[in-house]
UniProtKB/Swiss-Prot annotation:
SUPFAM superfamilies: Class II aaRS ABD-related, Class II aaRS and biotin synthetases. This is Probable proline--tRNA ligase, mitochondrial. Its EC number is 6.1.1.15. PROSITE patterns: AA_TRNA_LIGASE_II (PS50862). Belongs to the class-II aminoacyl-tRNA synthetase family. Keywords: Aminoacyl-tRNA synthetase, ATP-binding, Ligase, Mitochondrion, Nucleotide-binding, Protein biosynthesis. It is an enzyme of class 6 (ligase). Its main location: mitochondrion. The keyword Membrane does not apply. One of its GO terms (biological process) is prolyl-tRNA aminoacylation. It is found in: Mitochondrion. Present with 477 molecules/cell in log phase SD medium.
Length: 576
């Protein structure tokens, strides 16, 4: 007989004593996570994980870990949460305002790790000596810290969060890209295992830097990010990587905005002109200039850029000026005055017919040049990108190549999933007026058993149901995954309501009137294939005396004799 692990009654202390319909409907998702007992906020941006939330967090972590080990071929480590100032100075990231900084008793400075590029590179420097030691991918699942100025969105954007961060090391660009593709495939499998609808989008790697870059998002109206999706070719890109064109060029005659930039050698002043009601897209601007822009001046005001230009060029009269015109402008557009008083027209160059502003809804897709773009609000949950030698070079991580030369820097990649953020995002995705709806793989429990008040008859029925489930060989994965202990003061209706609010996919209702038949209320969402259970139902309903109905609230209910309960639950869980 399989042994069933019962829950300690002390866990009830973290459950809500009551849940009103108004609370379930009106609270934000992040507030409801606290009310139902998944987390509790201790300070702004800081959360304590309670038993329910920790179970879900650990299940997501294990799902990620399983794929990283089996498909990603990665090796797990655990780095210190405290990193030295020297490492971050070497990569010119110490002045990042989001770092939590601290000193020891001797005055030495450290930071709490927000990411671990510096530390993992410094670690692997001790173990990579030859090209034969690569490719290799290292990962960890640890807490990270960011001093967010305005933490918001609960566990979606806190000052402390659990993150899976992986780093690949390769001897050449080809192997580095192969690692990128391997982890891209692994990430797709991770999110498919979680049975959640996700999209991947080409993206900008941001301040961390890098070449190939892809983000993974959950589509939801509450998301802070915007993706642009083409209805024709299916391309999905982040807003900063999406290129669009108007229906017809040169149709904008209104006020024009201008942003100044310099080429990398500061010999040429670049003037980007675009409609005043649009936002300059720096990635598109870079493409228009074949990457020849000094991005350190990107966020500087125009006056500052002009001062640098005048300082670095002896005679402005003979210096080069390049105008880059967005394709929406025409000769009648209201251009701002040119700031330089002395210049030669012969030194002016011009690039026209390029799109250099953020895409908008219904504009033409820059990828296929046929379809229309549609904006999608989303929540970013993962990001993978190649780093090149951005970190291996300043930290001097070299290796002996095939020619026996020790002059080549390691090629790196970075692969992150916000684990705690993912829990918060899925909470948003599956939330309804009754609470949460989790995929079975990450629900705090897969099954709940709800009975009436404690008395000998109800206790015996509860034991019979548990024995039927846990003595079935096919139900071994339900060990320690059944919630049957509730506050004794809660009636059967309140227990069912609490189970639904917690998002437990299946609620087994054991009542005296229907016994020895039991009811199963389906709370889980069938995120993937929706009809697997129905095929089994049509095939075996007579054999198992299995009935399926929907009540007046649209809740799917299954009725089955206790001796067939395990088989039916096994079928129902497969597509949740």
């Amino acid at each position: 007989m399989l042994k069933y692990r019962t829950l300690s009654r002390s866990c009830h202390i973290f459950h809500p004593k009551s849940l009103s319909n108004n609370t379930l409907k009106s609270e934000t998702t992040q507030e409801l996570l606290q009310t139902v007992g998944f987390v509790r906020r201790s300070q702004v941006g800081l959360f304590q994980w309670l038993p329910l939330g920790l179970r879900s967090l650990n299940k997501v972590s294990n799902a990620i870990r399983n794929r990283m080990d089996s498909d990603g071929g990665a090796i797990e480590v655990s780095l210190s949460a405290i990193s030295s100032k020297a490492l971050w100075q070497a990569t010119d990231r110490w002045n990042n305002s989001e770092l939590f900084k601290l000193k020891d008793s001797k005055g030495k400075q450290y930071c709490l790790t927000a990411t671990c590029e510096e530390d993992i590179t410094d670690l692997m420097k001790n173990y990579i000596a030859s090209y034969k030691d690569m490719p290799i991918t290292i990962y960890q699942m640890t807490r990270k810290y960011r001093d967010e100025i305005r933490p918001r969105g609960g566990i979606l954007r806190g000052r402390e969060f659990l993150m899976k961060d992986a780093y690949s090391f390769a001897s050449n660009e080809e192997d580095a890209f192969a690692s990128f593709q391997k982890l891209d495939d692994t990430y797709n499998k991770i999110f498919k295992d979680l049975k959640i609808p996700f999209v991947s989008a080409w993206a900008d790697s941001g301040d961390i830097g890098g070449e190939f870059s892809k983000e993974f998002h959950l589509i939801h109206e509450s998301g802070e990010d915007t993706l642009m999706s083409c209805k024709h070719c299916g391309d999905i890109s982040t807003l900063d990587m999406s290129q669009s064109y108007p229906e017809k060029d040169g149709q904008y005659s209104g006020d024009v905005d201008c942003k100044y930039a310099l080429t990398k050698d500061h010999s040429t002043l670049i003037c980007f002109y675009y409609p005043k009601d649009r936002q300059l897209n720096w990635n598109l601007a870079l493409n228009a200039m074949d990457k020849d822009i000094d991005l350190t001046l990107r966020n500087k005001p125009n006056d500052h850029v002009l001062q640098v230009y005048e300082k670095d060029n002896e005679d402005i009269m003979f210096s080069k000026i390049l105008r880059v015109m967005d394709c929406r402008l025409n000769s009648k557009s209201n251009f701002p005055d040119f700031p330089l008083k002395k210049y030669l027209k012969n030194n002016f160059g011009q690039i026209s017919d390029v799109s250099i502003v953020d895409a908008q809804e219904n504009e033409i897709c820059g990828k296929c040049e046929e379809g229309r773009l549609e904006p999608l609000k989303s929540i970013e949950v993962g990001h993978i990108f190649l780093l090149g030698n951005k970190y291996s070079k300043p930290l001097n991580v070299k290796f002996v190549d095939k020619e026996n030369k020790n002059e080549t820097f390691v090629h790196m990649g970075c692969y992150g999933i916000g684990v705690s953020r993912l829990v918060g995002a899925i909470a948003e995705l599956g939330r309804d007026s009754n609470g949460f709806r989790w995929p079975a793989i990450m629900a705090p429990y897969k099954v709940s058993i709800c009975t009436g008040p404690n008395n000998p008859e109800n206790s015996q029925r509860l034991q019979d149901v548990k024995s039927e489930l846990l003595n079935d060989p096919t139900m071994q994965n339900l060990q320690n995954d059944i919630l049957d202990q509730f506050n004794e003061k809660l009636g059967i209706g309140a227990r069912i309501k609490l189970s639904h609010a917690m998002g437990i996919p299946l609620c087994v209702i054991v009542g005296s009137k229907s016994w020895p038949n039991v009811e199963i209320e389906v709370r889980g969402i069938r995120w993937g294939e929706k009809d697997l259970w129905r095929k089994q139902f049509e095939k075996r309903c007579s054999e198992l005396q299995w009935k399926c109905t929907k009540n007046e609230h649209g809740i799917e209910k299954h009725t089955v004799p206790i001796q067939h309960l395990a088989e039916v639950i096994g079928v129902l869980l497969k597509d949740m």
